[in-house]
Amino acid sequence: MGRMWLETDQDRRPFTFIRARFSDGDGSATSKYLPRNHLPLPAQAWLDRGIKQGHVGTGEMQFHGRLRDIRALNREMAGEFFVDFSIDRAEVFFAPGWQPASNGSGRVLFHNVSMDIDLDRVSYDQIDNGRARVTIADFENPSLDLRIEAGSSTALAVSTWLETPVGKQYRRVMSNLGSFDGAVSTEVNLSMPLRGPDPEPDVRVLVNFENASARSESWGLDLSQVNGGMEVTADGIRARKIAARYFNDPIEIDIDTPGRGANTRVSARGRIETRQLLNKLPSSLTRDLDGKSDWRLRLDIAGLSTPPDKPLLRLNATSNLRNTAIGIPLPFAKPAPAALQVTADVDFFEEQIWFNSKVGDSIRTRGQLVADDERDFTLNLLDVAFASELKSKTRRRLNIYGSIAEISIDDWLQYLEDSGAADPDLLGSVEL
């Protein structure tokens, strides 16, 4: 149903006005009602597959201007062409590798050589109640711009992100995390030229955590009350000053990926209970640590270019151990106010964890935790060297060796007995 009006000027150049209303249409047939001869082929291809399905409720088409090429009318501002309609149950495709948005409800507007799809309700993968906007500003030089805003639980956000092209590289690492809680709000911005055979989208995802949390039993990690924002692109992740709690201690987190395929570095700092950083060791070896110290943590997450025989995660931790009392006999013992510089490096593999540490100037440690069939890690070896270097050869169980000026054998025997470290299953050798 509509109206049409046609007139000519004194030079017999036609000027027309067309207005039509329509309803109960097929949203996937959108491009059939547009001036296809004036659209570049990549733009036509996207329109043919972009709106994959949908029900058109009501709409209107209007044209007024000279009967000329719409692109010329647009450049000369000598006429206008509109197609405006409501749509529901829409499914909109964006780019290869990305899931289409589904169950969309909103409006579609074509104005001269531009397009605007505004969906005030849309689902993306498992996330519902999102909002999306898709625009092509100029069909003569077409580029697709997309923005999706959505909120969901942390668990849904993580599982959805890992299925996207910008999240797949983190699947191995994230498979070790679970018990997700809290909420996440997300804004996906995608821009893709609609020219050339294989256009690559430029993606920028803004993520805001709202009291999110995650745990890793195998790695001894417990993060809670995570609040703050980060940016995810095809090149990696960036974030500044994310607030969180490591177990119950407040920390601040920065994240940076220097380039595509490179390791992602997570830096954290805070006053942390020292014993918690060693929670994967037998409690008999950590029970005499008491207090919280300022720690700086640097965590490198394996990137796409990391060889498979390298660790998934590499942790470096440093502290002066002020405010942590050590009840282990000399030369480890120290009161809480005293300083003792400690540096530790920990490598996380799928089935094992290796660690090395330097305590003060003359103590070195090395250890290995191995996973059983239930993915529980237990101590396989621990070397404690009172020396500037560790022996190259490793032996199972607890091995103490090196040179020390003074040591109380009675104190150590009593400590080993009280802690259970003297158990034959744990104690391997003592060479002092």
Feature map (PLM): residue ranges:
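Membrane-proximal interfacial segments on either side of biological membranes
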Residues: 1-118, 122-124, 128-355, 368-432
